[in-house]
């Protein structure tokens, strides 16, 4: 679904199977955010093609964290010299240890991915557009949120959802760190909240109300 100029949303709505929401930033950027599980990648690419996106022209594959339902399909882009694959440096370390072993809990093998774009907190330019990487751990070590100031679009992965938050009971999870990450994101000017699961939130007032709900109603249970 085309949300706005150059922002495409692919919500995962199948309650019988786990996967994540995926996003594509078009224009000069051509970045796929959170490609999801490998088994569902052909379906995702097919939906993108139906909307006129040349999937062979993808320049970046960026995962908000290394959990299987967000990252596994990145392996399909390894070896493609035209695609850079991004993950936070702490996420890479986690993936090479406990995070990789986590895949076995889901009956999967850890993917072999050549991550040639280690991400760090701070500004980053993608296809001539200015973005910001925010290190937002708590759900998983090395979790990031991608912020596009020009569009006031935030891709928080599994940090915050619509009236909910990402789990903290997976290996490397931390309730206190997740709270810090959410408070950090709440200070941003956001028009589009595009989370890793559940629905998207559009409108600055609605986004702010969601942050307030999570802080006031959900924080006491973290």
Q: Which residues does each PLM region occupy?
A:
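Residue-level marker for buried hydrophobic side chains located in beta-strands
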Residues: 31-33, 62, 85, 155, ...
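Short, flexible loop segments at the rims of nucleotide/cofactor-binding pockets, characterized by
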Residues: 8-13, 36, 61-64, 131-134, ...
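Short, well-ordered secondary-structure micro-motifs
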Residues: 22, 96-99, 205-206
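Active-site HxH/HxHxD metal-binding segment of metal-dependent hydrolases
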Residues: 37-43, 49-124, 213, 217
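Short, acidic/turn-prone active-site loops that include or flank metal/cofactor-
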Residues: 15, 90-92, 160-161
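Conserved beta-strand hairpin/beta-sheet module of binuclear metal-dependent hydrolase folds
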Residues: 1-51, 145-157
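Short, charged, surface-exposed secondary-structure boundary motifs
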Residues: 19, 94-98, 164
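Metallo-beta-lactamase
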Residues: 38-39, 130-222
């Amino acid at each position: 679904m085309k949300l706005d100029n150059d922002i495409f949303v692919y919500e995962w709505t199948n309650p019988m199977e786990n996967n994540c929401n995926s996003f594509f930033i078009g224009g000069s950027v051509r970045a796929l955010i959170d490609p999801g599980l490998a088994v569902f990648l052909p379906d995702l690419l097919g939906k993108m093609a139906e909307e006129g996106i040349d999937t062979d022209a993808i320049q970046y594959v960026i995962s908000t964290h290394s959990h299987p339902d967000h990252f596994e399909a990145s392996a399909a882009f390894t070896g493609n010299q035209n695609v850079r694959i991004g993950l936070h440096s702490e996420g890479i370390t986690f993936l090479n240890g406990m995070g990789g072993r986590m895949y076995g809990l889901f009956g999967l093998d850890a993917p072999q991915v050549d991550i040639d774009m280690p991400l760090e907190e701070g500004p980053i330019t993608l296809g001539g557009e200015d973005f910001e990487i925010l290190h937002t751990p708590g759900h998983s070590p090395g979790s990031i949120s991608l912020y596009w100031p020009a569009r006031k679009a935030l891709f928080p992965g599994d940090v915050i959802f619509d009236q909910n938050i990402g789990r903290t009971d997976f290996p490397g999870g931390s309730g206190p760190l997740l709270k810090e990450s959410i408070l950090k994101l709440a200070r941003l000017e956001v028009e589009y909240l595009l989370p890793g699961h559940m629905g998207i939130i559009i409108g600055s007032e609605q986004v702010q109300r969601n942050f307030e709900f999570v802080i006031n109603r959900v924080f006491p249970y973290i």
